[in-house]
Amino acid sequence: MSAITPYDWAIIAFVIGVTFLCVFMLTVPLLLGGKSWGRAKQEQFESGVVSAGGARIRLSAKFYLVAIFFVVFDLEALYLYAWSTSVREVGWLGYTTVVIFVVDLLIALVYAFSVGALSWAPADRRKLAGEKVKVGSPTMNIAEITRFNSIEELVTDPTGQIPAQSSGRVKSKTTPALSSEKE
């Protein structure tokens, strides 16, 4: 068995440090944290906002397209970086392979653009519908620009309200009429 080298000591110190840090981060909150229980303590929240509605919210497929585009172009960058580090060794065969790879990705990008996968803005949808798009006018109405185009875009909970309405923080359109009838 050989003697322990300085590199071995560095690895041992790193493992000990990581273990200590993990144990520290797991035990200190248990020791210093509060122990109170209650209904409000068990309620989930995100970024300081109490959640409203169910967790089964349908997301637009455009979010998945963003993720897929990221993966595709991230992998493209990875392959091109690997090729660029070995460009002298692979020669013309490697260059030809990379050109075919990039052309293939460009064809996929043109196809995605042609089917409308890259038109995400509400203005693009309005142009396709034949509406006149007002951008940057002094009388710009943000509510009109960001309105829902159809009920399919509006995710509702079982009560038929949007999640903010079911939490009671936003009044529905029928609420003021009901309150005026009671008076």
UniProtKB/Swiss-Prot annotation:
The chain crosses the membrane at residues 11-31, 63-83, 98-118. Gene3D superfamilies: NADH:ubiquinone/plastoquinone oxidoreductase, chain 3. InterPro entries: NAD(P)H_OxRDtase_bac/plastid (IPR023043), NADH_UbQ/plastoQ_OxRdtase_su3 (IPR000440), NDAH_ubi_oxred_su3_sf (IPR038430). It catalyses: a quinone + NADH + 5 H(+)(in) = a quinol + NAD(+) + 4 H(+)(out). Keywords: Cell inner membrane, Cell membrane, Membrane, NAD, Quinone, Translocase, Transmembrane, Transmembrane helix, Transport, Ubiquinone. One of its GO terms (cellular component) is plasma membrane. Disulfide bonds: none annotated. It is an enzyme of class 7 (translocase). The keyword Membrane applies. It is a multi-pass membrane protein. The keyword Nucleotidyltransferase does not apply. Residues 159-183 are annotated as: Disordered. It is found in: Cell inner membrane. It holds the Pfam family Oxidored_q4. It comes from the Bacteria. Its EC number is 7.1.1.-. GO terms for molecular function: NADH dehydrogenase (ubiquinone) activity; NADH:ubiquinone reductase (non-electrogenic) activity; quinone binding. HAMAP family: NDH1_NuoA. NDH-1 is composed of 14 different subunits. Subunits NuoA, H, J, K, L, M, N constitute the membrane sector of the complex. NDH-1 shuttles electrons from NADH, via FMN and iron-sulfur (Fe-S) centers, to quinones in the respiratory chain. The immediate electron acceptor for the enzyme in this species is believed to be ubiquinone. Couples the redox reaction to proton translocation (for every two electrons transferred, four hydrogen ions are translocated across the cytoplasmic membrane), and thus conserves the redox energy in a proton gradient. Belongs to the complex I subunit 3 family. This is NADH-quinone oxidoreductase subunit A. The gene is nuoA.
